[in-house]
Amino acid sequence: MEAVVNSDVFLTSNAGLKSSYTNQTLSLVDEDHIHTSDKSLSCSVCNSLSQIVDDDFISAGARNQRTKPKRTGNDQSQQPIKKDCMVSIDEVASTHDWSTRLRNDGNAIAKYLTTNKYDTSNFTIQDMLNIMNKLNIVRTNRNELFQLLSHVKSTLNNASVSVKCTHPLVLIHSRASPRIGDQLKELDKIYSPSNHHILLSTTRFQSMHFTDMSSSQDLSFIYRKPETNYYIHPILMALFGIKLPALENAYVHGDTYSLIQQLYEFRRVKSYNYMLLVNRLTEDNPIVITGVSDLISTEIQRANIHTMIRKAIMNIRMGIFYCNDDDAVDPHLMKIIHTGCSQVMTDEEQILASILSIVGFRPTLVSVARPMNGISYDMKLQAAPYIVVNPMKMITTSDSPISINSKDIYSMAFDGNSGRVVFAPPNIGYGRCSGVTHIDPLGTNVMGSAVHSPVIVNGAMMFYVERRQNKNMFGGECYTGFRSLIDDTPIDVSPEIMLNGIMYRLKSAVCYKLGDQFFDCGSSDIFLKGHYTILFTENGPWMYDPLSVFNPGARNARLMRALKNQYKKLSMDSDDGFYEWLNGDGSVFAASKQQMLMNHVANFDDDLLTMEEAMSMISRHCCILIYAQDYDQYISARHITELF
């Protein structure tokens, strides 16, 4: 383990403006095939499009509207672009007021770098601050540096990289092949503009009035229908059962299909797609989808998956937790190959990484040591979708447990074996593991050095906890009967984290299901039986356990939890006299509640937990932790910056 004390490590870390993104693993477009809505055994994209046609998202009495493309002066734009041409995508978006000035500042910095022929290979945050001083650009909010750096990077990369290895969205914007236009015309017929517009409008309107699942407590929650087999995955519930800053903007307000359409037809995108565009343009690595061999088809399939997840979000917030076979998103997410990770992912990490990669969501920027030749290293800024915590590689004791709190949150390292950012507190020995180079950027005075924090976050911060003891074996417990062993090492999880003067609260957690999670949460069972989610709502912790409808023990535990929650409401949170009430006045309520659960219908209050129960389950069984700012504070902070 190497240790270097440097309070300015974040400011002097390489910002990585020269992107290593390359798409040369795939061809540009399939010259022999146009994707249609006809089902095909040989094309997974056509099958996805056929499901969109069959879906009746929302009915409304609106006429189908045709999008009129912007006319150009000649047809030269439809000709293929030579591979040695340069493509500029600067100024492609009209933005919200709060981001207009940020983008203009980013463009000014990028122009300064280009005009002065600045060497961007060693560009650091300190260099950017120096340029900002020269240009009289004042940014007092530390988190704005994350977004400002993204603006500079996207402008430089896509203005100076040749067409053959640049981003697919740039190729669509530049109309690099006539076949792109032919494919988008066919898509325009498949995505009925009226129905798709209604789906977008409905989910955006729903988002305006949604905070968490307690906002839907006046609805009945339906877990299963007799003709359905699939259910909303707990990871989807953790991400969208509560409104998370930045992710909500990219997934609900942004839309991949309209982004592609606007880039091709108008060469500009509308304000609601701006954050999605910036996320996509600053990707470090492309994704590859099994069975899809070209870039344009990959973008189409990405748009299909985004639409399927949007429908799942709408259903989640309406209390519909089941889905038909054709609507299941999980099989599509499992087919995505993440080229930036060099090891086999577990099922839950695969689903989490795939959901975030659809919109290029990487909310955490960390200064980490990247290995170079020999034993040397280079400090670089690394954007990460989530931070990996591996209890099996950490040496812990009862006096020194793994702690995720405001003090240890600054301890990050880069795992060269997997290409991921890992949580590596120096006091528990993770730095001795092969492939991990650990740098102590703050020395001993962590709390007093927050201004030099090596971590900045855009809205949300996610942790993935590797608890599977045999993770290198292929998963699929639901299909093969294979049972993973789970490491239940307790983790000291703080409900709140203070980072750069901003409070991030624990909003949701996905846990491994080992027992019934009510009577035997302290069970010695170590075999994985599934997953469940705990959301921290305005009314308290709430559990989403879709597998409880299939297990007699879990059904009984759920009924008992619902009855106790009802009694606490009547008795001012007291447990005394519960069984007397159950045999007396509560017998009618118990019978009606049992009938509801037999029909797989529940109310929000039925699955409320105490804070002690929730934190106990999360400590031993969590696999995903999601911290976030309060959404209203996140949005208002951006409007307040306009005043200055």
UniProtKB/Swiss-Prot annotation:
Q: Name one Pfam family in it.
A: Pox_P4B
Q: Which UniProt keywords apply?
A: Virion
Compartmental location: Virion
For this protein, the record's InterPro entries field holds: P4B
| Role played | Major component of the virion core that undergoes proteolytic processing during the immature virion (IV) to mature virion (MV) transition. Essential for the formation of a structurally normal core.
Q: Which domain of life is it from?
A: Viruses
Tell me the protein family, please: Belongs to the orthopoxvirus OPG129 family.
- Indicate the residues removed as propeptide on maturation: 1-61
Q: Where is this region: Disordered?
A: 60-81
Q: Does the keyword Iron apply?
A: no
Q: What does the record say about PTM?
A: The 73-kDa precursor is cleaved to a mature protein of 60 kDa during virion maturation. Proteolytic cleavage of major core proteins OPG129, OPG136, and OPG098, which occurs at a late stage of core formation, is required for production of infectious mature virions (MV).
What is the protein's species of origin? Monkeypox virus
- Its name, as the record gives it, is Major core protein OPG129
Gene name for this UniProt entry: OPG129
Cellular component GO terms, alphabetical: virion component
